[in-house]
């Protein structure tokens, strides 16, 4: 008796062979479906409307506040930063402070403005404008300041 006859006698029946052949054919069909590109289907095309730049009037009013401040000590820097966090632009006049404290406030506010994605611009000698991300600063002010600025004594 050959090995194939023994194997056939103990393991494979004609029904099992037929089931295995059917599974093999089914697997081949699935592989062909995966290899073929999908059929193109007609999908109705809807026209995409461009976004409208509509802003409610209340939102526009709220984001258009400008706060004018004249701090006298460095401890007021946190209050200025709170205005910026509240999405309000701030104009700061630092002329009534010592230069050292004014530099510290500008450094602090520069970090704050960077953290909220805003901007800081110098408007004049010791006068700055800090804006949050919802306010854009357009244009520039020429640097025709006093003689102190021209002699480069302490420029910051």
From Swiss-Prot:
Regions crossing the membrane: none
A single BP term in Gene Ontology: FtsZ-dependent cytokinesis
Coiled coil: none
Listed Pfam families: SepF (PF04472)
Compartments (UniProt record): Cytoplasm
Gene Ontology CC: cytoplasm
Protein origin, superkingdom: Bacteria
Main localization of the protein described in the UniProt heading: cytoplasm
Disulfide bonds: none
UniProt KW keywords: Cell cycle, Cell division, Cytoplasm, Septation
Described function: Cell division protein that is part of the divisome complex and is recruited early to the Z-ring. Probably stimulates Z-ring formation, perhaps through the cross-linking of FtsZ protofilaments. Its function overlaps with FtsA.
The family this protein is said to belong to: Belongs to the SepF family.
PANTHER family: CELL DIVISION PROTEIN SEPF
Subunit structure: Homodimer. Interacts with FtsZ.
The protein, known as: Cell division protein SepF
């Amino acid at each position: 008796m050959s090995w194939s006859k023994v194997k056939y006698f103990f393991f494979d029946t004609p029904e099992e062979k037929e089931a295995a052949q059917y599974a093999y054919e089914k697997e081949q069909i699935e592989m062909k479906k995966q290899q073929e590109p999908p059929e193109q289907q007609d999908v109705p095309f809807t026209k995409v409307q461009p976004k409208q730049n509509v802003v409610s009037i209340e939102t526009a009013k709220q984001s258009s506040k400008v706060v004018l401040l004249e701090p006298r000590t460095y401890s007021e820097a946190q209050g200025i930063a709170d205005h910026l966090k509240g999405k309000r632009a701030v104009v700061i006049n630092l002329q009534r402070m010592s230069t050292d404290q004014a530099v510290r406030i500008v450094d602090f506010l520069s970090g704050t403005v960077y953290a909220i994605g805003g901007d800081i611009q110098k408007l004049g000698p010791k006068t700055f404008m800090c804006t949050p991300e919802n306010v854009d600063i357009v244009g520039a002010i020429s640097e025709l300041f006093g003689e102190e600025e021209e002699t480069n004594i302490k420029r910051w």
